A protein has these predicted regions:
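Substrate-engagement module of ASCE P-loop NTPases
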Residues: 268-276, 323-347, 375
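Residue-level signature of catalytic and energy-coupling elements of molecular machines
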Residues: 146, 210, 240, 272, ...
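Mechanochemical coupling/switch segment within NTP-driven translocation systems
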Residues: 235-237, 249-302
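Conserved ATP-driven motor cores of ASCE-family P-loop NTPases powering translocation/secretion/packaging/pilus
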Residues: 137-144, 349-440
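Loop/turn-to-beta-strand initiation segments
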Residues: 233-235, 298-302, 339-348
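Short, glycine/polar-rich helix-capping loops at beta-to-alpha or helix-loop-helix junctions
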Residues: 238, 243-249, 354-360
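Accessory regions of macromolecular translocation/handling assemblies
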Residues: 1-234, 278-281, 301-304, 309-314, ...
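Residues immediately C-terminal
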Residues: 244, 310-314, 338, 354-355
């Protein structure tokens, strides 16, 4: 098939357009029909033979129509997109004209918009070139114009030295729907599908921060992660100072792995830090260049700290209580900074991730950051920092929010919907019990 130049520039004269392609389609069919039927009409043969030829010709013409329609369908995406971008350039006067001696006006310079189309993902990428001319400033602020002409919501905008990227999706990513299983699943790799095209791997992107108020779906999402961790033979420790949903899991995991009081929380943090130190000692004694915990046969260990702010507030003001807080926060700091290579990971959750709860330097070392539910601009900044998007869409679905994953290629947090779990159909405790015989 012919290749369509994926550039919109008003200086160029484009031979092919969606309208011309449509004319070519129907003209080809009309001419082919006339030629074939004329030939059949001049054939000297019995009438029933000619009727058979007419029927066969009609079938062939129909097949030709389908083939041309398919080719046109494939090309129309690119042509209509190019024509839309040319319309943007023209109506926003992103060009310079020159009148020759006869008074004829000619475009001598134009802003240039390149585009790429990924039909499998439903993704449109538009690159507005920055060339240092008078249009370079204007092409950096085409957000609303492009969104309007494409009738799509802008997903992400990235300003690079020589061009501006505008990302759009015309296919909504699929939200993951969890299904019940009657038997235990064992997964060897650490990739976790979070839906919406997000694959999380703690080795590549260590540690998780989850922020969300009451009714945001935070507890359900953490429950989903607990099952995913168990499927990968992880050991899980839970600190829940509010003794709420996660704290109640002590009935199934045991008090060794679930803590709700300050002293017990300090105990499990100490256990995790000691495990990390022992692993590092083992890896030093059995040194392999470039290796990590998995190369030495270790499985992941996860420390889940729910409502970190509540823990800091729950301890008393006496000296011993303060020492407990300092010990726990120091252990959390060690895990965040040193845990990845040893396979020790942490998930920190809070209703609001204030700097007093976790300082920004440590927050930025949490590779996967999620803010569930509606939030204020300040609330998003406390979670995402410099990765907070300029424009935020309203959160209308329970379990929806914004997600930022380091190393994903995204410069800002993206709208995301957490895996859907129908509590009426999905028995979390029953699923959990499948994994309690050989883990924890």
């Amino acid at each position: 098939m012919f290749k369509i130049k994926q550039v919109a520039d008003l200086k160029w004269n484009y031979i092919l357009s969606s309208h011309r392609l449509k004319l070519m389609h129907w003209s080809t069919l009309a001419i082919s029909t006339c030629i074939i039927f004329s030939i059949i009409a001049n054939i000297r043969a019995p009438d029933f033979i000619r009727i058979l030829f007419y029927l066969l010709s009609g079938f062939l013409i129909y097949k030709l129509h389908l083939k041309l329609k398919h080719l046109r369908y494939e090309a129309d995406y690119y042509l209509i997109l190019r024509e839309s971008l040319l319309y943007v350039l023209h109506t926003n006067r992103l060009y310079t004209t020159y009148k020759d001696s006869s008074g004829y006006e000619k475009i001598i310079r134009s802003a240039t918009l390149e585009y790429e189309l990924d039909r499998q993902k439903g993704h449109v990428l538009i690159k507005a070139l920055i060339t240092g001319d008078e249009f370079s400033k204007k092409v950096q602020s085409l957000d609303d114009v492009l969104a309007g002409v494409l009738e799509l919501e802008l997903d992400e905008k990235i300003i690079r030295p020589s061009f501006v990227e505008y990302h759009f999706f015309y296919k909504k990513p699929e939200r993951l729907v969890l299904q019940s299983h009657n038997q235990k699943q064992e997964i060897d790799n650490l990739d976790i599908n979070l839906g919406y095209g997000v694959i999380f791997n703690p080795i590549k992107c260590p540690h998780i921060l989850v922020s969300g108020g009451t009714g945001s779906g935070k507890s359900i999402f953490i429950s989903v992660l607990i099952l995913e961790f168990f499927k990968r033979k992880s050991t899980i420790y839970i600190a829940d100072p509010k003794n709420s949903d996660l704290g109640s899991l002590s009935h199934y995991l045991g008090d060794k792995y679930v803590a709700t009081t300050p002293n017990n929380i300090a105990r499990i943090v100490r256990l995790v830090v000691e495990e990390m130190q022992e692993r590092y000692q083992y890896m030093r004694d059995n040194f392999q260049y470039g290796s990590n915990f998995a190369d030495h046969g270790f499985k992941p260990v996860w420390l889940l700290v729910d409502e970190l702010g509540a823990f800091q507030a729950s301890a008393g003001t006496d000296k011993k209580s303060k020492e407990t807080i300092v010990e726990v926060m120091d252990g959390i700091k060690q895990i965040i900074l040193l845990g990845r290579q040893a396979g020790i990971f942490i998930l920190v959750s809070a209703q609001q991730m204030r700097a007093e709860t976790l300082n920004t330097d440590l927050r930025d070392n949490l590779g996967l950051r999620i803010a569930l539910g509606a939030n204020s601009n300040e609330g998003y900044r406390m979670v995402f920092g410099s990765a907070t998007p300029d424009k935020l869409k309203p959160i209308e679905e329970k379990g929806a929010g914004y997600l930022y994953m380091q190393g994903s290629g995204k410069e800002t947090a993206q709208y995301w919907e957490s895996p859907y779990l129908d509590t009426a159909q999905f028995d979390f405790i029953k699923e959990l019990q499948l994994y309690l015989t050989e883990t924890n």
